[in-house]
C-alpha cells in the first residue's frame, strides 16, 4: 500500500493552473518535444502545468508559465535521456553534455540534440527574469542533474546496487528538485541574498525539502520504476533488495519522509521569527513545493498510475 503524507500547513494552487497547462502543452508542441500522438496523450494526463501551479501558487503569470514549460521539458528529456530508456546508449553522453553546454555557452550546439532548443528557450527566459546570481543557483542544480545522471547510470551498470547512503547523494541531484527549489523565492517575495541562500540553516531546509520530495516520489513511482528498462533502483527498491519485504521497504521510506517533514518544520519555526521578508517567503516557498508535489500526485497526475505502467514505463521504442 502506498502511504499518504500529511503536512502541518495548507494546500495552495495558482488560479491560472489551466492556462499554464495549456501553455506548457503548446510549448512542447512548438519545440518538437512530442514524438507521437500517444506521447501527447501521456503529457495531457500527466498535467505538468498543475504541478507548477501547486508548487508556485503565488508566482506571477510570467514565472508560472516559465516553470510549467520547464517542467514539461524536464520530465520529457529526463525520461528519454535517462530513466525510461536503455541504461547507456551512444546518445547518452551527447544528450546530457548538450544540456550543460546550453548553460555554459548560452547557445545551441552545431548539431542540436532533441530538446536542446526548448532548453535554450527556458534558459533565455529565466536569465531575463532572474538576476545573474539567482540564475546560477538554478543552473548549478541543472548541471548537477546532468552530471549525477552518470553516477546513476554507473550504479545500474554494476553487478549490484550501492547501499542507501550513496543512493541518497545521487538521488538529491538526479531528481532535478534543487533547481526547482532555487526558484521558490522568486515566486514569493523576491530573491533572498546570496548570504542568506547559502547559509547552513537555509541549506539544511533545502535538503529537508529535497528529501521529502525525492523519497516520497520513490514510493509513489515504485511500481513504474520497477518496470523501467534502464533506471529501476530507488530507495524502496534498495531496502527491499537488502532483505525487507517490499511493503516493509515502503513503510520505512515513508517513516523517513515524515521525519524530514518534522525536521523541516522544527528548523523553519526557529529561523522564521528573525528572517527577512524574502527569506520568510523562500521558506514558505519550500513548504509550497513539498505540499504542492504531494497534492499533484494525489489529485492531478496519472504519471505513476498502475493503469499506464505497461504503456509508459519503457520508452526505448520512442524515436526522437
UniProtKB/Swiss-Prot annotation:
A Gene Ontology BP annotation from the UniProt entry: terpenoid biosynthetic process
Residue ranges crossing the lipid bilayer per the database entry: none
One GO molecular-function entry: metal ion binding
Cofactor(s) named in the record: Mg(2+)
Coiled-coil ranges (or none): none
Signal sequence annotation: none
Keyword Metal-binding: yes
Keywords tagged on the record: Lyase, Magnesium, Metal-binding
Binding site for Mg(2+) 3: 217, 221, 225
Pfam families the UniProt entry points to: Terpene_syn_C_2 (PF19086)
Cofactor note: Binds 3 Mg(2+) ions per subunit.
Motif placement: DDXXXD motif: 78-83
Disulfide bonds: none
Site (Plays a critical role for substrate recognition): 79
Annotated protein name in UniProt: (+)-corvol ether B synthase/(+)-corvol ether A synthase ((2E,6E)-farnesyl diphosphate cyclizing)
Organism taxonomic ancestry: Bacteria, Bacillati, Actinomycetota, Actinomycetes, Kitasatosporales
